[in-house]
């Protein structure tokens, strides 16, 4: 990994760790017993086992001049200084207060998971993971809301995530990104309390003209138009996907 990615940071993930499987695994249970891990202080033995693994990876990377980034599950147990934590579960006062002891990246699912539907008319939208996240909701995210002053100094930035389980064409990808990426940009660079939705909404007309000039596919729900154009519909079956791929060769 370090040969492939020369950056200072290496993201080790750390979320979606199947603790139930660890608890059912004889080797994992034996390792917990060997390490003297047990449920205490609001954490399970399996969570402390993950912390043990995280600490070993962190030391290895630190010894090689790198730093770890991980999702907020790496806070479970004891996390050494120097880690960077990505939070996805909530915002401000709703996150684990220990987050503010580390450099962090804000990526709350309610605002920054842009694999969600962009309109309430989901039957006319390309199939998605679910939920509803229009461009105005992305724009409405205030990273500092509910964050203590000392915590604001630890926020490195904001990240949006487009998980692509259902995204199988470039046009579909563009549709999910645009214009929500424009909203993300203002969340990132406009000073706290200075965003203005009405101004931004008018500016989207200019952005749309650029998208059109570049031949990009984008969501037009902000203009009252729902769904992908007919010539950019995503493949919904393996056969449709193969037909699409053949047409691009």
Which residue ranges define each predicted feature?
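Flexible, acidic glycine-rich loops studded with aromatic residues
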Residues: 67-83, 87-249
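Active-site neighborhood of glycoside hydrolase catalytic domains
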Residues: 1-83, 88-101
């Amino acid at each position: 990994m370090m040969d492939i990615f020369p950056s200072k940071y290496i993201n080790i993930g750390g979320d979606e760790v199947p603790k139930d499987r660890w608890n059912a695994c004889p080797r994992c249970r034996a390792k917990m017993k060997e390490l003297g891990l047990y449920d205490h202080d609001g954490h399970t033995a399996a969570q402390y086992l993950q912390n043990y693994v995280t600490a070993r990876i962190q030391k290895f990377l630190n010894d090689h001049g790198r730093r770890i980034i991980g999702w907020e599950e790496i806070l479970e147990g004891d996390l050494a200084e120097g880690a960077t934590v990505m939070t996805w579960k909530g915002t401000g006062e709703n996150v684990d207060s220990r987050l503010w002891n580390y450099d962090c990246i804000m990526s709350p699912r309610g605002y920054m998971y842009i694999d969600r539907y962009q309109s309430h008319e989901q039957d006319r939208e390309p199939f998605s993971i679910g939920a509803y996240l229009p461009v105005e909701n992305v724009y409405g995210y205030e990273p500092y809301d509910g964050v203590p002053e000392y915590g604001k100094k630890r926020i490195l930035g904001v990240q949006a995530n487009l998980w692509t389980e259902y995204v199988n064409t470039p046009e579909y990808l563009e549709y999910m990104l645009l214009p929500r990426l424009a909203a993300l940009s203002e969340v990132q660079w406009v000073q706290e309390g200075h965003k203005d939705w009405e101004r931004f909404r008018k500016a989207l007309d200019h952005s749309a003209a650029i998208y059109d000039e570049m031949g990009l596919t984008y969501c037009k729900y902000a203009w009252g138009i729902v769904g992908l154009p007919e010539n950019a519909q995503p493949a919904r079956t393996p056969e449709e996907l193969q037909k699409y791929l053949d047409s691009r060769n």
